[in-house]
Amino acid sequence: MPEQKMFQPRIHTRLPDNTVIQYYDSHPINESQIMDAIKSLDLRDEPLRPHHLFAFDQDHFGGLEATRTLAQLSQMNAESAVLDVCSGVGGPSRFFADQYGCRVTGIDFTETRRKTAIKLTEMVGLSDKVTFIQSDATEMPFDNNEFDIIVAQEAWCHISDKNQLISECSRVMGTGGTLAFTDIVKHDAATDRTLERLGHEMTFQGLASINDYVSILEHHGFTIKEASDLTDEWARILVKRLEMYRGLEQKTTAVHGEARAIEWDRAYSFFVNRYQTRELGGVRIVANKST
């Protein structure tokens, strides 16, 4: 039998490490925006709790329910050791710890996101259950077989080396563990011009197709339990997200400047429209580590 050919993405735009960091450092969803939302809560003398943040710290397609779905599909419970890969400002990590009682480690490449995640986690009293580490997802600082569950949401589109990423997930996960993630994927209609522009404007690198992900996961010892095409659902969600971001235009301008606000709107509009042309799509994959 011929050796299985590994997925090798065509990198239309290979970005320096700091480009992705800069992208998230100037993101409309940021510490300032979240702190303003907290101040607007009418808590009176009530202490800030994790659920108070759920309305605005779940920066993922489908919001809280999408995060809950990953937890349910991975059969998360109080005994689970969970790794959130590309954890951002930590909303899902806090949700998992609060709702399921598990211990969660979040890793993110962007230090400002990690610091915000730590601050918010301290504010809601979950620092004993949730830890955040600055780390490259392709070189994780963990021992072999350290986690039962690995989750991620719409972040691996920024990582060019999908093979090494999945290899690291396999290494740090114990046999029988579950990987549950969602990501932005390309469809056959995606043109080189589109992918290059998304690389420059959205810092997407080496976008995989659904079949690419399945191939990589199986190569690294995972058995696919679910690979759901979310393209149609996300096409609807993203139109609403664009409206949400436009509602933050004044705050984005105040924090990052008018030029960045205009640049973001142009880039995100183009991104959202690629779902209408079906050049881009979404996937939710659940896989068990079998070897």
Residue ranges and their predicted role:
Residues M1-K39:
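N-terminal auxiliary segments of SAM/dcSAM-dependent transferases
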Residues L43-P47, H60-A78:
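Conserved alpha-helix/loop element of class I SAM-dependent methyltransferases that forms part
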Residues A81-E139:
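Class I SAM-dependent methyltransferase SAM/SAH-binding core
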Residues T138-I149:
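A short acidic, Gly/Pro-enriched loop at the edge of an enzyme's catalytic core
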Residues N163-T178:
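A short glycine-rich, Lys/Arg-flanked "PGG" loop and its adjoining helix->strand segment in the class I
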Residues I184-F204:
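Short, glycine-/aromatic-enriched active-site segment of Class I SAM-dependent methyltransferases
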Residues Q205-G221, A227:
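Short alpha-helix
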Residues E226-T291:
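Conserved Class I S-adenosyl-L-methionine
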